[in-house]
């Protein structure tokens, strides 16, 4: 599926149907050094989160995805290490690969409590190792949600700490053949890291090729004035995209004129 075909279908509300809020847009799944040089064309690879496609079983959902040209699968990270064999078997012989892994860790990296940070590090590394076994492009993480307290203050020192810890995680992810993917959220969900540009600058400062970032049209609607500017600012660190309708966070195209993604896709192209 190419960019023009996807945009035409979603903008008239006739995109690939789904039973859950999100479908996803993913960059090429094998590891690379970024989206390529400006002016180069990049393939559009659609990916669904695990429960997006209709079906009672995983096999039925994967059948649906294949029938509609969806070539990526984004499972959750919780208990992922115990599911590696199951997922490999389910994907065997299919034109579907694991794209990103959606979080699933315990604790959080910016907790003021050492034991909570240690729990995050332990469980995140378990997920990263499983992601590598599955050939995933990376594990999505958020530094802290609004409900997670006590949390480190929003200071330059906290940013320095985050950069240092992500460098270690990123280097470990590279050893496992995958990456860590930072996801900016809107201010109603997270006080820290709300724009793609900020995520990209953190990726840069880690100095690790195992730390990348992503954009999400839903969060960008609240936090950025330009989709083009937001995604272009991600540069070579941008690895994955989430897309949803911009008014109700459902299927792209369901909210009429609000669901205009053209500027964002221009940046991705």
Task: List PLM regions with ranges.
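Mid-chain, structured segments of secreted extracytoplasmic proteins
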Residues: 91-115
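Active-site acidic/histidine proton-transfer and metal-coordination neighborhood
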Residues: 8-22, 35-38, 110, 114-212, ...
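Histidine-acidic metal/acid-base catalytic patches
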Residues: 2-50, 54-69, 135-137, 193-215, ...
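Active-site-proximal loop/turn and secondary-structure-junction residues that shape catalytic pockets
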Residues: 52-54, 79, 104-107, 145-147, ...
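Short amphipathic alpha-helices and their capping/turn segments at secondary-structure boundaries
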Residues: 82-95, 123-135, 163-171, 226-233, ...
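Glycine-rich, proline-tolerant flexible connector loops at the mouths of alpha/beta enzymes
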Residues: 75-92, 143-150
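N-terminal substrate-binding region of glycoside hydrolase catalytic domains
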Residues: 64-82, 102-107
